[in-house]
Structures are given as C-alpha cells and as structure tokens.
Amino acid sequence: MVFLSSVETDQRKMSAGNHSSVTEFILAGLSEQPELQLRLFLLFLGIYVVTVVGNLSMITLIGLSSHLHTPMYYFLSGLSFIDLCHSTIITPKMLVNFVTEKNIISYPECMTQLYFFLIFAIAECHMLAVTAYDRYVAICSPLLYNVIMSYHHCFWLTVGVYVLGILGSTIHTGFMLRLFLCKTNVINHYFCDLFPLLGLSCSSTYINELLVLVLSAFNILTPALTILASYIFIIASILRIRSTEGRSKAFSTCSSHILAVAVFFGSAAFMYLQPSSVSSMDQRKVSSVFYTTIVPMLNPQSIA
C-alpha cells in the first residue's frame, strides 16, 4: 500500500507539469555582501533615473516636434519606448531588493516578469536591426528612401518587431510553466530569467534549453548580422565622402551606435548562446547588467 501510494504521488507530480511546488522565490541579487548594497542601490538608482529621463525626453521631443515626424525618429521613439519598458520591468524590483532583507518574489509575479522581460528583450534586438536598416537606406539609397521607408512599411516593421517579441516570450514562458520547480526557492540572479529558473527544475529541461539556444540564435544572430551588413555598406558610403569634416562627423555618429549595439548583442550572446554549464551564474549576472540596464541608458545618447 505504501508503494502504491508513492507511485500515485509520483504520477501526480509528473502529470502536474504546469505546476510548481514553490509559491515564492528569493532573488539572490547581484551581490551577497551587505556593505555593497547601499552603493549598488545608489548606482542603479542613478542609472534608472537617467534611463527614464533620457527615453521619456526622446519620446516627448519626437512626439511634440512635427519636423521630427520622419521614419528615422519614428523608429527611435519606438526604441526608446522599448528601452523604457525593458528597464522598468527589471530595475525597480532590483532597487527594492537592495534595501530589503528578504528579496521575495511570488511565483505568478516571477512568471509575469519573465514574460514581459522576454517580450521587450526580443523586441529590442529586432528594433535595433530596423533602425540600422533605416540608416542604411537613408545613406545608401537616399533617392528611394521615401518609397522604401513609407509610413505603411514603418508601421508593419514595428508590428513585426512586437509580434516576434510576443511569440518568442510566449513559447519560452509556456514551456517554463510546464516545469516542476522544486529543488530550491532561491534564484541565483537579480530577476527571473530563463537559465536561473531552469536550474530549479526537478523535471527535464532539455527541450527548454534547446529552445533557448535555437530562439536566441534567431533573435540575436539574425538582427546582429543585419546590423553588421547595414554598417558595412554605410561605412563604404562614408568612405566615399570627399569632405574630411563630413566623413569624421558621420563616423562619430555611427561609432557611438555601433558601440551600444556591440555591448547589447555581445552581453546577450554571452548569456543565451551557450549552455548553462559553460559559464558561472555570477559571470552571467554581470553580463546581464549591460543589456538590462546599461544599454537602455546609453541608447538615447548613442543612437539619436
């Protein structure tokens, strides 16, 4: 009878693939050293304030200035909105955790944070590619710019960016909800992300890890290659500019954008384009700071 009861219990656990024995998690945060918490709080509070002010200013300025109602600034305002949302999903909770003893997040709140984080992270990848393509058309095909980048095309490009974000996030979160999380309730991260949550699973994570690698390859490498190709053509066009002043101005504008893009895709690739066993979670936490907080702060200054 005891054996049968044990078997029935195991079967119920296996069939409850979309449930977790954990009702709340403890976020380990960036550092466990108490003396660093206040310094980290002040640092990331400053970064978040700059991010919010910079991106809101960009959106407001573009919205109120009729002469900025062009495809380029339309995409820049869209990118600022994504950056604002991307940072807001992560940073406020992280700031609270710096000044509280127990960094608790409920299971539903954790899954919600994961879902919206993935939407805007994936959307940012593709929006950066769209802005690079827009610059390529403007510089390399200026006579066809108004035809290629019509408002109709701009609208559908933006829709495509969000569709890819929602689709990718729904797939990842849906498969995450199927896992039985029971090893521990401590997430070794400062927010609910894919690999830290997979590490808590008592059931097989093979499909989840395969999906992370496949979808990350598409959502990171495809936009990155699009941006790389766009800037190769842009730089080739810049080199044909006879004016030294015009060439240096164009290079300075592009270099700041390339730097922000390189930091974003480089840190994202380090986090998601390798198996979880390759690098430590502490290394991944440091890497994730760049694409969750640093790049959203830099984008308004580097891309405009």
Curated annotation (Swiss-Prot):
Subcellular location: Cell membrane
Source organism (scientific name): Homo sapiens (Human)
InterPro entries: GPCR_Rhodpsn (IPR000276), GPCR_Rhodpsn_7TM (IPR017452), Olfact_rcpt (IPR000725)
Record's bilayer topology term: Multi-pass membrane protein
Claim: Disulfide bond is one of the keywords in the record: yes
Protein name, per record: Olfactory receptor 8G2
UniProt main location, coarse: membrane
A family per Pfam: 7tm_4
